[in-house]
A protein has these predicted regions:
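N-terminal leader segment of winged-helix/HTH proteins
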Residues: 1-19
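Short alpha-helical "packing" element that flanks the helix-turn-helix/winged-helix DNA-binding module
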Residues: 25-29
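Short, locally clustered residues in the helix-turn-helix/winged-helix DNA-binding domain
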Residues: 30-37, 97
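Canonical helix-turn-helix DNA-binding module
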Residues: 38-80
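Charged, amphipathic alpha-helical coiled-coil/dimerization segments
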Residues: 62-112
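Terminal interaction helix/tail motif
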Residues: 95-136, 141
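Long, low-complexity, charge-rich intrinsically disordered regions
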Residues: 134, 139-175
Length: 175
């Protein structure tokens, strides 16, 4: 099974090289595009990619030099850094780093079954490595919906509707 997963990962990673990004840069850019506003610090990127802080620091620096991301400093704590995609970064992700049928050409039924099975495998790996799951906000035990309003009870903040489908560092699966 491992060789299949490795081969699929290489096929997906090879597409990033055609756009001038190495696989780590493409993975970091894709993560930042999918992460919520609370999960875009360098340490969050490193934890998600299971990479060293040094590797991620150089990766983020390269993405910033390419004009794909911009550094944001916290108003509350000037030492705290997060990254947002620039317009060029969003355009690149939209065009090349997607789950579109051309990127992943399988039927919906096969994709759903593969997703379910791969999710189970991923959960086992993450548990074995004692790594964070980084799930979607809407699947978190702290995600609350009241009418059209969304709220994170853990961070005590209101959420935009679009944040429900973003990856969160703090996510804890609902029971």
């Amino acid at each position: 099974m491992m060789w299949l997963i490795e081969r699929m990962a290489r096929l997906l990673a090879s597409e990033a090289w055609t756009e001038g990004l190495n696989p780590t840069q493409a993975a970091a850019l894709q993560y930042l595009a999918r992460a919520n506003r609370f999960s875009r610090s360098p340490s969050h990127v490193a934890d998600y990619l299971l990479a060293t802080r040094g590797t991620v620091s150089q990766t983020l620096k390269a993405l910033q030099q390419k004009g794909l991301i911009a550094e944001q400093r916290s108003d509350a704590d000037r030492r705290s850094i997060s990254y947002d995609l620039t317009d060029d970064g969003h355009a690149l992700v939209k065009e090349y780093v997607t789950d579109s049928p051309t990127t992943f050409p399988v039927t919906d039924d096969l994709a759903d079954a593969a997703s379910e099975n791969l999710s189970a495998v991923m959960q086992e790996w993450l548990t074995a490595r004692n790594a964070r799951p980084f799930g979607l906000c809407r699947n978190c035990q702290y995600h609350q919906v009241s009418g059209k309003k969304r709220h994170c009870a853990l961070l005590a903040v209101d959420l935009a509707p679009s944040e429900a489908d973003k990856i969160c560092f703090e996510q804890q699966a609902a029971p």
